[in-house]
């Protein structure tokens, strides 16, 4: 993202190399002072491309603050007053105050909940409506230092708005697989039960017809 007049209070961090097509040309991003650099990831995000219009010219001022919620709500990070934030598998809630409407890029790096590292790319721009992005939202990456996926959300937001983004980690992602396996087991059991009942009814009908034939 390019530095603009609106972003003079930001510090440059060598934190992002978004792959543009087959090559990586953008190796800079800007974060507001006070954000911890370890929220951002330096090496190339392989096998991922974003449109040209998202590449440059959007380094406007953005202030991101994190809020703490009970883990029981299912939306929880554990955020500390010193600016560090540990994301749980349930999600991340934060508010953003923008100096002007525009596009913002943020990568959040969670390394404390699981041994593996997880990276999330978030696009934020005007009018405050969450939108799906036509790129895969969960894409596995091989040969990189993280072994699960990258979640991508488009959020339209004007300045001084608060919004929620539902981040999902690998432990939560495994739940649908478990549910699918359970569903398959249930379906097979139901089919077996139905077949057994039909067989039993067929035996009863056969015996009944036989008894009628012999006048029992």
Curated annotation (Swiss-Prot):
<keyword id="KW-0325">Glycoprotein</keyword>
<feature type="glycosylation site" description="N-linked (GlcNAc...) asparagine; by host">
    <location>
        <position position="147"/>
    </location>
</feature>
<feature type="glycosylation site" description="N-linked (GlcNAc...) asparagine; by host">
    <location>
        <position position="25"/>
    </location>
</feature>
<feature type="glycosylation site" description="N-linked (GlcNAc...) asparagine; by host">
    <location>
        <position position="82"/>
    </location>
</feature>
<feature type="glycosylation site" description="N-linked (GlcNAc...) asparagine; by host">
    <location>
        <position position="97"/>
    </location>
</feature>
<feature type="glycosylation site" description="N-linked (GlcNAc...) asparagine; by host">
    <location>
        <position position="109"/>
    </location>
</feature>
<keyword id="KW-0244">Early protein</keyword>
<feature type="glycosylation site" description="N-linked (GlcNAc...) asparagine; by host">
    <location>
        <position position="160"/>
    </location>
</feature>
<feature type="glycosylation site" description="N-linked (GlcNAc...) asparagine; by host">
    <location>
        <position position="142"/>
    </location>
</feature>
<protein>
    <recommendedName>
        <fullName>Early E3 25 kDa glycoprotein</fullName>
    </recommendedName>
</protein>
């Amino acid at each position: 993202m390019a530095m603009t007049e609106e972003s003079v209070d930001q510090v440059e961090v060598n934190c992002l190399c978004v792959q543009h097509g087959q090559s990586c040309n953008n190796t800079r991003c800007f974060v507001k002072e006070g954000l911890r650099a370890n929220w951002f990831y330096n090496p190339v995000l392989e096998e991922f491309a974003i449109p040209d219009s998202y590449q440059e010219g959007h380094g406007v001022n953005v202030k991101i603050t994190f809020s703490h919620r009970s883990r029981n709500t299912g939306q929880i990070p554990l955020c500390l007053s010193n600016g560090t934030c540990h994301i749980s598998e349930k999600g991340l809630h934060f508010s953003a105050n923008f100096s002007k409407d525009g596009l913002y890029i943020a990568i959040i790096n969670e390394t404390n909940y699981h041994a593996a590292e997880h990276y999330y790319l978030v696009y934020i721009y005007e009018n405050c409506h969450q939108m799906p992005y036509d790129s895969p939202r969960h894409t596995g990456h091989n040969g990189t230092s993280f072994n699960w996926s990258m979640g991508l959300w488009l959020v339209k937001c004007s300045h001084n708005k608060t919004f929620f983004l539902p981040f999902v980690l690998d432990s939560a992602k495994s739940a649908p697989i478990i549910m699918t396996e359970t569903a398959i087991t249930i379906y097979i059991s139901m089919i077996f039960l139905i077949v057994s009942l039909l067989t039993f009814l067929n035996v009863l009908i056969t015996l009944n017809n036989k008894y009628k034939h012999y006048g029992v």
